[in-house]
């Protein structure tokens, strides 16, 4: 039995970046031998075991063969006679098809085992597929795009990009299950440069299949006096990258991605203006989230940001009553944490424009101060003093909040 560290751990070690995942392959062992040594079996489709002490995953060396369309259409072969090179050959990219032996004490020993020249591709900053079997797994399209968001200075090899296009043309991207699409998109959004993920997906044609609502944004013009970058797709990528640069949460980054979807459906005769795009964005986000089974926190923030971002940009023009109505409409009084994320998404929108990434955004501070004031009102005490009439209570609480905001912002009305 020989144990090897494989894949991302070796890649990241060579790149000098923190190792995010550690995967191990065991050559020359049977499932029974693994169990006898205290490993706990957890794999459904093929033998994967958890180490008794570290709980890290160890998989028996295996080969795989495509038997049907889609992500699950594989037949696996695992046995003590499967070699390390055979196991590495089934992997997606050369930079992920390297290994080092692990000593009984758990240390990496010996040279890097690199049968597909992954080290050369690391030096060249190139994503290159290992072999023709790459086309058998459509998830690899999404994985390469996600890696591009993490390693933003890498490019996709021409022959690899051609294979990805062939896969898309053959309908392989259509066979991807919703959960896996969302998983990879979400992980890519949380990388350092999410726009690179979408660039790769566009380049191979996959974005139009998995996120057609986003793909449709490129080529849609905006007013140059508001958007020097003009193209809506370019703007949205700048917004997402700004949110990533600030380290914002996944819900904020997803809201940044989807806030302007409605601009793709603006009638051609009114371009480059986009009156009413907020409502159209909401109507596109709803089915998108249902289709990809997007988590509720991401969906809910995306919807409120899409609907209200235009209003939020204009809050410097609002009086106290309008601000309180805005808080009530966006549920800021009950959900201040979500409202804080809404501010982050809208600030990203304002700064995700060509040459405007450092411009002041006083709207955020105005809203923070106003919200603290509005939430300081004791609605319970007011209700006890008014009586049982629900409408009277609501009106009295609203008026008290307006007065509190007036005082906090020194607004004379």
Swiss-Prot record:
Gene3D superfamilies: Beta Polymerase, domain 2, cca-adding enzyme, domain 2. It comes from the Bacteria. GO terms for biological process: RNA repair; tRNA 3'-terminal CCA addition. One of its GO terms (molecular function) is tRNA binding. Its cofactor is Mg(2+); Ni(2+). It catalyses: a tRNA precursor + 2 CTP + ATP = a tRNA with a 3' CCA end + 3 diphosphate; a tRNA with a 3' CCA end + 2 CTP + ATP = a tRNA with a 3' CCACCA end + 3 diphosphate. A single active site specifically recognizes both ATP and CTP and is responsible for their addition. Monomer. Can also form homodimers and oligomers. Catalyzes the addition and repair of the essential 3'-terminal CCA sequence in tRNAs without using a nucleic acid template. Adds these three nucleotides in the order of C, C, and A to the tRNA nucleotide-73, using CTP and ATP as substrates and producing inorganic pyrophosphate. tRNA 3'-terminal CCA addition is required both for tRNA processing and repair. Also involved in tRNA surveillance by mediating tandem CCA addition to generate a CCACCA at the 3' terminus of unstable tRNAs. While stable tRNAs receive only 3'-terminal CCA, unstable tRNAs are marked with CCACCA and rapidly degraded. This is Multifunctional CCA protein. The lineage of its organism: Bacteria, Pseudomonadati, Pseudomonadota, Betaproteobacteria, Burkholderiales.
């Amino acid at each position: 039995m020989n144990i090897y560290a494989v894949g991302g751990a070796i890649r990241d070690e060579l790149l000098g970046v923190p190792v995010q995942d550690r995967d191990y392959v065991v050559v020359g062992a049977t499932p029974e031998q693994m169990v006898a040594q205290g490993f706990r079996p957890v794999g459904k489709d093929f033998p994967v075991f958890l180490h008794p002490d570290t709980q890290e995953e160890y998989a028996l060396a295996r080969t795989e063969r495509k038997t049907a369309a889609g992500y699950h259409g594989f037949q696996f072969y695992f046995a003590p006679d499967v070699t390390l090179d055979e196991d590495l050959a089934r992997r997606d990219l050369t930079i992920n098809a390297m290994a080092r032996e692990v000593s009984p004490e758990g240390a990496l020993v010996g040279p890097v085992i690199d049968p597909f020249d992954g080290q050369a591709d690391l030096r060249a900053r190139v994503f290159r597929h290992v072999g023709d079997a790459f086309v058998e797994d459509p998830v690899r399209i999404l994985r390469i795009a996600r890696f591009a968001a993490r390693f933003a200075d890498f490019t996709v090899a021409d022959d690899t990009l051609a294979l990805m296009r062939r896969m898309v043309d053959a309908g392989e991207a259509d066979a991807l299950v919703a959960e896996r699409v969302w998983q990879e998109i979400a992980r890519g959004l949380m990388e350092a440069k999410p726009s690179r993920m979408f660039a790769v997906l566009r380049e191979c044609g996959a974005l139009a299949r998995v996120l057609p609502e986003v793909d449709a944004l490129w080529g849609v013009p905006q007013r140059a006096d508001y958007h020097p970058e003009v193209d809506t797709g370019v703007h949205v990528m700048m917004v997402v990258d700004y949110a990533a640069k600030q380290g914002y949460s996944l819900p904020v980054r997803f809201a940044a991605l989807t806030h302007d979807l409605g601009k793709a459906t603006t009638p051609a005769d009114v371009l480059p203006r986009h009156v009413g795009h907020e409502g159209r964005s909401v109507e596109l986000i709803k089915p998108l989230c249902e289709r990809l089974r997007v988590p509720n926190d991401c969906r809910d923030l995306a919807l409120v940001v899409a609907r209200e971002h235009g209003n939020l940009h204009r809050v410097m023009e609002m009086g106290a009553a309008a601000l309180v109505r805005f808080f009530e409409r966006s549920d800021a009084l009950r959900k201040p944490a979500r409202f804080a994320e809404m501010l982050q998404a809208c600030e990203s929108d304002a700064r995700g424009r060509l040459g405007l990434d450092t411009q002041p955004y006083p709207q955020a501070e105005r809203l923070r101060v106003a919200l603290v004031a509005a939430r300081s009102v004791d609605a319970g005490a007011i209700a006890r003093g008014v009586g049982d009439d629900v409408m009277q209570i609501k009106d009295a609480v609203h008026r008290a909040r307006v007065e509190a905001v007036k005082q906090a912002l020194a607004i004379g009305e």
